[in-house]
């Protein structure tokens, strides 16, 4: 059964790998786009670094990146109050913005492939949000300390229940 699952995963039935291979080949054909995107990312990260140092030294510093209106993931005040969590949040937002913008400006993709790349890029970006990880989420850290880790145990037990219901596979609905 495991070999069948591996084989199915390698078949790329949804054409995800093919879509990204097309994207990457078009990006390679336009090195100026890639160089410009990389330079813009570096410049914004440098601004964040400078702003973060100012904040750490107690000086006023405007945020370089802010969550989109309605983005509930960073609602906890610790995301703005804490130097470290503010830096993590803004660094993620900058990287996410640049990745999405860069991949969205690659010329020559057909509409179906462009939509597929956009969808899976958003999934990837959202999956890597610092809110999804224990050590980079102040709310989860606070609850973990307050509950002596019981929140993590409960989450792990929920995962095991989901796997059992799915016959050993995680079925997200």
Description of each model-found segment:
Residues 1-173:
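Amphipathic, low-complexity, repeat-rich surface-exposed segments
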């Amino acid at each position: 059964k495991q070999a069948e699952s591996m084989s199915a995963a390698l078949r790329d039935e949804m054409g995800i790998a093919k879509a990204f291979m097309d994207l990457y080949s078009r990006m390679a054909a336009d090195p100026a786009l890639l160089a410009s995107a990389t330079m813009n990312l570096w410049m914004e990260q440098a601004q964040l670094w400078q702003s973060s140092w100012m904040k750490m030294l107690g000086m006023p510093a405007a945020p370089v990146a802010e969550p989109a209106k309605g983005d509930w993931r960073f609602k906890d005040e610790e995301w703005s109050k804490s130097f470290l969590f503010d830096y993590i949040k803004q660094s993620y937002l900058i990287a996410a913005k640049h990745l999405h913008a860069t991949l969205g400006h690659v010329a020559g993709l057909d509409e179906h492939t462009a939509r597929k790349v956009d969808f899976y890029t958003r999934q990837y970006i959202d999956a890597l949000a610092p809110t999804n990880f224990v050590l980079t989420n102040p709310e989860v850290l606070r609850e973990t300390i307050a509950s002596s880790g019981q929140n993590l145990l409960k989450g792990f037990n929920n995962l095991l229940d989901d796997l059992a219901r799915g016959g050993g596979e995680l079925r997200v609905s």
